[in-house]
Amino acid sequence: MGLEHTFYPAEDRFEPLLEHSEPVNFVPKENAKSYVRQGFASPHQSLMDNLVDSTESTKRSENFVSHIPLTPSHSGQSEKLMSTRTSHSPYISPTMSYTNHSPANLTRNSSFNHQHYSTTLRSPPSMRGRGIDVNSSHYPHISRPRTSSDSQKMYTRAPVDYYYIQENPYFNNIDQDSISDKSLPSTNQSLHHSEEDTESDNDFSESIHPEFDIDVFYKVSNILYDESDLQDPEKRERLEWHSMLSSVLKGDVMQTEKRRLRLTEPDGHSGTYISEVWLGLQAWLHGRLNADQAEVIRKSREGVEPVLREVIDFQIQDEETTKPPLEQVTEILEKVEQCKQFYISSREMEENVPLSASKEFNYKLNALISWSNVMESIQVETLVLQKWVGNDEFDLTMRTPQFNYDGVENTSSFVERIFRQSGLQRTFEQRTLTTLNRIIHQAKQTISENAQAFEEMKLPTYEDKLLPLVRFPIKLLEEALRLRLAYAKKIKGPNFLIVDSMLDDFKIALSVAVRIKREYIKIASPSPGWSLPTNVDEDYDNVLLDSLKFYFKLLTLKLSSGNKNLYFKEIDFLENEWAFLNEHIYWINGGDIHMAGQFSYLSNSLLLNVHRYVESHLNGPTERTAASLTNWYSTLLKNTQIRFRKILRFSETLNSRFENASDFVISEGHLPDLVNRLSTTGHFLAYTANLERDGVFVIADHTLSENPEALKALLFSKDISNLETIQQNCSYVLILCPVHPIVWKGRIEKVDVPDFSVDLKTNRVRIIASNKREHLQAAKSVFQSISGDLVTLAVECRSSITRVYKEFIRLSKLCMRISSTVVDCVSAVREACSGVNCHDLIYHVFSFAAEFGQRILRFLSFDSYWQTKLKRKITSLAVEWISFICDECDLMDRKTFRWGVGALEFLMLMIRGNNILLIDDAMFLKIREKVGKSMAFLLTHFDVLGAKSKVAAKLQRESTEVSSSPRLTSFGDVEEEALSIQLLQKETMLRIDELEIERNNTLLERLAIGHVLDDSVFRNRDFIKLASSFSNITIRWQQGHFVRSGMFGDVYTGVNMETGDLLAVKEIKLQDSRTFRSTVDQIHNEMTVLERLNHPNVVTYYGVEVHREKVYIFMEFCQGGSLADLLAHGRIEDENVLKVYVVQLLEGLAYIHSQHILHRDIKPANILLDHRGMIKYSDFGSALYVSPPTDPEVRYEDIQPELQHLAGTPMYMAPEIILGTKKGDFGAMDIWSLGCVILEMMTGSTPWSEMDNEWAIMYHVAAMHTPSIPQNEKISSLARDFIEQCFERDPEQRPRAVDLLTHPWITDFRKKTIITMPPATITKKTSLSHTITEEKTAQLLAGRHDDSKAETDSLAASYKEESALPVASNVGLRQPNELRIDSINLPPAIVTPDTINYSVD
């Protein structure tokens, strides 16, 4: 045990020990005397806990006996003196007691190390943070400080400074000491510990009282005396006494004894001591004496070895006569565990019972433990899945009733709940299925590692219990795909948005399905003791193939939708889909053949579209001017070239992927010879039992006899796992279709190959290799060396897949048709340009057709018939090209010379070789004539000695005249035609309104059902608000991808599974009981508001679906994002574009106010845009419906206290809302917010953007300040006046939305601009056009409106007379409503401001 020797001052004399010292208080004399007699101080505090950074003035004794090595001093070194003060400070207690720890009783231990010194002087850890005064004693024998009345001297440095002075030598000393004494624990690893580390329990050794190593201070420079001290007899006596003490403690004898004591008990406790402690604890736990407990343990240990023998000889007994296997294993394991309790550790047990250390025992014991753990995990996971699915049979299609708050029975299967709540991808990422996968792999590993032990102990395999778990993901995905296919096939004529959504869904489903199949095959792979079905069910493969087929159907719909955004990206889209499916198609049985055929079909369809595009545009524009013709045909040629090159490149890549065969014709009468040669060269006949009935035989190379899977892969063009080996052996398969029966004398092997169609003519043989061209060429060489002259090559390279080859032939024909059309387009262009000087255009058409024909010729190199036919057509084109140059162009123009040279070179290329022999006489004579004429005019351009160049330069300087022809424009009278169109539109709208009224009435009748909830249940009382709503619906829908997260819930896309319409689904969770009621009130308030609104500029609300823990709100899906997203790219610079948005904002707000609703949170983030750019008000969570007062003299705020509540976003908030003052006319607060939104659209930055927090914004708004409005040079004066009216400080004077609709800034725009809006349907009652009389409309359009209050009141009254019908919400997505704004139509697609087309008279 470490002891502290406390040295106290002498009797009464106190003198300063150091110069510049801070006064230090010492222990009083009376306390010193008592503890000098004892000679010891309290050992319970570590030495470094005595270091205190004290800022109070204390005194130091003159007679203090310092622990200092006797070395000469260095006069004048004040820093060393100061260092001494801190270096010897470990012997200063925090209560002014100076202590010294004897090295004889202190052991150096790495746990108690110098990390305590690495920080500044501080209080002990036991006192830190507990409100204890560090300047008061924490030792019981020191209670009162005492100060000296003698003279004192102060330090010139702070205590921390002196600590840092001695820090470096201190650490160096520690490092040197650690290196010099290798036998002791190293303390270097503690050097870098932080201050926080020193306060942890890990800093101390396992011994009760850690010892302190005093040696680390011997080398610290801490000389506190000088030569004058040696002259003083008393001081010299003390110094000599200390030198003697130091010599004794540092001597060899003392150091040797210290090391010997350390080595005898390195851990501080002996084994006997630990055993006694353990025995005492066991006796105390069992309520016995130590002797009695020792006897009990001794007798119990006698029965340990039989238990171990029982483990070694353990075997499962018959279940009919004994317990189940799991109980038997659990019982024997409990016995072993009981035996282990009789020993302190496994080492003691192995020493006492050597059998427990034997390999046989541990092998059997580990096997039993592994088997038991896996069985228990399987049972737990089975219960979890049964609870999740809802039944014990894992029946995923069983419909179970769910809680429904409207009283209508709502049953759904487990798969439908998966679609509704999380979707496939997130379902397979959940913890339940990941845990299941881990348990299955763990079970397989356990069986593989302990298969022999399980067999010896007759432990039953748990495959029968594990198989339902292994097949669960397969069954889940199979039912999910089947259900998704059933719903998808119900969709009739889906638009491109629905097609995109379904493509994403099926892409995720296919990738997940393939991943699950791969995992199953990996799990089911053979292993010792592991035997599961290696293949998935056939039904799973069938539904996976059906999903792939429907996926291609969706691809076809997308490519044929006519979407302009996809026009030049069709091939890029196909290439991405090809890359995706190429990764997964190997795992879909039959999918590779279907994929090859479908992609070939799609590429041909795109090529056919190019051909139709060329044919439809050959006639040219209606306006026959040089500029219009050049622009028209240049665009046509450019688009055709880009699309055709991409399609042809993709088709070539596709064909090269599946080109793996060649066809040979068998010479007449040599069939038996060929068969004999094949049978004698090691080939074998692969008997399929299917193809032989059709007269088709499969003969394979001898290298495939031991690899039937490779044979199947070659037949079906699949990827081969050992492709390199197949290529090295030049393996191949022959398909023989003889005219007469054959006699096979070689080997016959039965091969299980499914039936497939073979498009092979009789008396032919087809060789099939891999899709590597080198492999096919090598296989052909081997086959031809065997067959010799018995066969003749018919088709050099083709695909063995029938549909791919047919599509390739179709592609060749399409290329031929397009080439012919392009060549013929030259004559069409020349005819369209007759009478117009378009020689440049015609020349470029000739050049394009020539280059196009050359590309097709290279592609058709395999077919001599089509190639010859096309060559003749292109040769005729070359002759026409020369004729055009010689007959129609200016022969004196140098440009004509360049054109003529190019045409002659192209003609020479086309008639080279034997091609000139294929030309008939008439064509050859024409060629000679035209070539001679062209050569004649070419000679006129030859410049001999540069004479013509000089003449041409002179003529160029003299010609300066430029001619131009005026353009005349005439306009016809269209007033009569416009009137007829207007009458037709009115009649159409009346009919549509009648149909809408009838439809809405029918839907209202269908929704008039339900059941009253039991309001005695407390939780149901809050749900009555939601469940009693007529918009509470039940539809089959699927959750899509995540859109964004809001304050009250997350928004996802959704698909109505019955109609295929897209929805926006807001999911609000009701799990927090603290906010349950407020959330329900919030949902009910938003539903109440949305049910009253039905307008094209308000997001459409479809209904709500109430569940026990969540609520789904179905709304219109706005694909264009929010106005805030649009403004993130910058402000709207064009004021006319800005007005298009402002008109929609005003119309929507006017309608909202006419329905007695305040929005109260208008901001860009709450204003959405649909896929056509229409403005939509959304997020009515803060909105408020205000019932109109019965007394016209009563104001809204008098009957609706909620109007006084603070609601909205501070930067868009009106002053009266912050101040709580008068509110003005109904909706005045929304007008201020609308002005802030319009200002943000003008500037691109939020209002009050210069403020750094919301409190500053509220302060400025409350002070009646207005946001900064742009200068007049940025906006027009009318726009500035409009904004200033929105920011009217007095809410009584602030205009309403209907007032702003009559503002000149709006009416002038309406008179000049014709804006169109997409057609849709709405009841006549909600149409804004019928509320304004024709006379009033004419006045507003003509600008002859009266600005008086009566006029605007009349217009507002017309809005207030409207009452929107409730939204029919159980039949899917409704079409956007049509809004007639004073006979002005709104834009069809406002995606971005620069895409808005408007025309100004």
From Swiss-Prot:
**Which top-level enzyme class is recorded in the Swiss-Prot or TrEMBL entry?**
transferase
Domain (Protein kinase) spans 1037-1306
Which SMART domains does this chain map to?
S_TKc
Positions of the region Disordered?
A: 67-99, 176-205
Q: Give GO cellular component annotations, separated by semicolons.
A: cytoplasm; cytosol; Mcs4 RR-MAPKKK complex
Q: What SUPFAM superfamilies does its record include?
A: Protein kinase-like (PK-like) (SSF56112)
Q: Name one GO molecular function term.
A: ATP binding
Record field: catalytic activity: L-seryl-[protein] + ATP = O-phospho-L-seryl-[protein] + ADP + H(+); L-threonyl-[protein] + ATP = O-phospho-L-threonyl-[protein] + ADP + H(+)
Keyword Thylakoid among record annotations: no
A biological process (GO) annotation for this entry? p38MAPK cascade
Active site, per annotation: 1161 (proton acceptor)
Question: Pfam families attached here?
Answer: Pkinase (PF00069)
Keyword Nucleotide-binding assigned to the entry: answer is: yes
Compositionally skewed regions (Polar residues) per UniProt? 72-99, 176-191
E.C. numbers: 2.7.11.25
| UniProt keyword terms in alphabetical order | ATP-binding, Kinase, Nucleotide-binding, Serine/threonine-protein kinase, Transferase
Q: Which CDD domains match?
A: STKc_MEKK4
Superkingdom assignment: Eukaryota
Name the residues that bind ATP.
Answer: 1043-1051, 1066
Family classification: Belongs to the protein kinase superfamily. STE Ser/Thr protein kinase family. MAP kinase kinase kinase subfamily.
Q: What does this protein do?
A: Involved in a signal transduction pathway that is activated in under conditions of heat shock, oxidative stress or limited nutrition. Unlike win1, it is not activated by changes in the osmolarity of the extracellular environment. Activates the wis1 MAP kinase kinase by phosphorylation.
Q: What is this protein called?
A: MAP kinase kinase kinase wis4
